[in-house]
C-alpha cells in the first residue's frame, strides 16, 4: 500500500467535470480520479476548513460511525476495473475491524473528515498513476528503467488506453 495525499480538486472549464488528484507521498506520481460535483464539494469544504450550516452526507456518516463506537482507520483505493476505481473504508470497533466497499470519492471525503491516511494499492498506481509536469500540470509520458525488461507489447500504449486518458489530457490542456 502506498500512502497518498489529496493534492487538488480540479474542475474542467469546458464541461465542469471534477477530478480529485491524489499524490503519492513518497514520490511524484499522481492518481487522477473523476468524481461527482457533490463529492468534490464535500472534499473541498473540509480541505478549505469551511463551515456549513447543516451536516453534509459525509459528516453524517462519520458521526454515525463514531456514535456507534467505530473509528475510521484508513481508506484504500484498492482496484481499477474497466476505468472504474474501487475503494474500501477500514472501520475499527471494539470487537473487530471491517472493510466496507465504496466509491473512492466517498472514501476520500470521509478520510479528510476523519483525518485518516489515504492509501492506494501499487497495482492501481501502476495502471493509472501518472507524472505531472510541475510547471504546466500536464501529464508526462511514463518512465521505464532499462532493467524493466518489458516487451514492446507491454510498453506500447494501446488505442483503448489512449481513449481512456484522452478525457484527462483534454481536461489538463483546457
Predicted regions and their residues:
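Divalent-cation
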Residues: 1-174
Amino acid at each position: 500500500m502506498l500512502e497518498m495525499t489529496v493534492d487538488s480538486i480540479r474542475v474542467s472549464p469546458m464541461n465542469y467535470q471534477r477530478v480529485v488528484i491524489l499524490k503519492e507521498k513518497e514520490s511524484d506520481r499522481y492518481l487522477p480520479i473523476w468524481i461527482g460535483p457533490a463529492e468534490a464539494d464535500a472534499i473541498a469544504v473540509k480541505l478549505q476548513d469551511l463551515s456549513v450550516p447543516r451536516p453534509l452526507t459525509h459528516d453524517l456518516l462519520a458521526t454515525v460511525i463514531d456514535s456507534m463506537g467505530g473509528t475510521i482507520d484508513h481508506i484504500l483505493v484498492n482496484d481499477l476495473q474497466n476505468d472504474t476505481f474501487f475503494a474500501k473504508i477500514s472501520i475499527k470497533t471494539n470487537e473487530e475491524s471491517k472493510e466496507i466497499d465504496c466509491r473512492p470519492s466517498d472514501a476520500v471525503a470521509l478520510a479528510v473528515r476523519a483525518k485518516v491516511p489515504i492509501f492506494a494499492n501499487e497495482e492501481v498506481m501502476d495502471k493509472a498513476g501518472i507524472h505531472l509536469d510541475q510547471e504546466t500540470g500536464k501529464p508526462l509520458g511514463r518512465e521505464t528503467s532499462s532493467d524493466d525488461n518489458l516487451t514492446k507489447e507491454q510498453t506500447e500504449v494501446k488505442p483503448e488506453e489512449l481513449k481512456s486518458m484522452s478525457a484527462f489530457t483534454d481536461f489538463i490542456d483546457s
